[in-house]
Amino acid sequence: MKNNFIIATHNIHKIKEIETILNFYRQHGEGYRKKLPQQAFPPESTVSYEENAKEKALFISQQLPAAKIIADDSGLELPAFPGRYGVQTARELAQEVPDGDLNDYLIHLVDGKSRQFIMKTTIALAINNQVVKIGHGQLKGTIAHAERGVNATGFDRIFIPAGESQTLAEMDQPTRISYLHRARAVKNLLDQLGE
C-alpha cells in the first residue's frame, strides 16, 4: 500500500531527497509546508539523533494528528576526530565553515589522518501525537581526495562507500540510493511497517 508521508523539515534539499527515496520505494512524501504555514521547530538537543527526530515528528504531528509525519536527524562521524560532529554536525560545520566549501574543508581536514567516515540517520514516524516507529541507517566509507561525479551534490561528491571505488555522485540513482544513509533509514522504517 502506498503511504503518504509528511516530512517535518524546513530543509528543501532534505525534502527533495526524502521524496526521491520514498518514490524509489513506491511511497509518497511531501514537505509539511504543503499542509501548514512555516513552523518554528523547537531547538534540537545534543543528546541523540533519535531524540531530535522524535521531537520534530511529534511537533508537526500535534498539528496534523491524522497524518503520517516523518522527521530525521543525521550526522557525520569521523574516526580521526572522535567526539567531533555527530549529533551537532550541522551546527559545528556551520561555525567552522561559515560560507565556505564543506567538501573542500573535509577533504583537507582528514589529510594525513584516517579518511574513514560514518554517516548516520535516524528517522521517526509519528501518528496521532505518538512516535510509532524508528528507522536507522548508516553509511561507512572513505572521503575522496577530490570531488568526483555529477549525479548528485554535497557530500555525495566526496563520499566513497566501503568496498566501492566510485563516489556516490558517480553512481547511477538506483545504486546511489541503495547506499544512502537516509535511504537505509527509510527502508528500515518501511520494513517495520511491512511495506
Swiss-Prot record:
- What is its EC class? hydrolase
- Which species expresses this protein natively? Limosilactobacillus reuteri (strain DSM 20016)
- Relate the activity to temperature as described in the entry: Optimum temperature is 35 degrees Celsius.
Q: Name one GO molecular function term.
A: nucleoside triphosphate diphosphatase activity
Q: Which SUPFAM superfamilies match?
A: ITPase-like
Role played? Pyrophosphatase involved in the biosynthesis of tetrahydrofolate. Catalyzes the hydrolysis of dihydroneopterin triphosphate (DHNTP) to dihydroneopterin monophosphate (DHNMP) and pyrophosphate. Shows a strict substrate specificity. Has only weak activity with GTP, ITP, XTP and dTTP, and cannot use ATP, UTP, CTP, NAD(+), NADH, diadenosine triphosphate, diadenosine tetraphosphate, ADP-ribose and UDP-glucose.
**Superkingdom of this entry's organism?**
Bacteria
What is this protein identified as? Dihydroneopterin triphosphate diphosphatase
Name the cofactor(s) required for activity, per the record.
Mn(2+)
User: What does this protein's record comment on cofactor binding?
Assistant: Maximum activity is obtained with Mn(2+) and activity is enhanced with increasing Mn(2+) concentration, at least up to 8 mM. Has low activity with Mg(2+) or Zn(2+) ions.
Gene from which this protein is expressed: folQ3
What lineage, starting at the top, does this entry show?
A: Bacteria, Bacillati, Bacillota, Bacilli, Lactobacillales
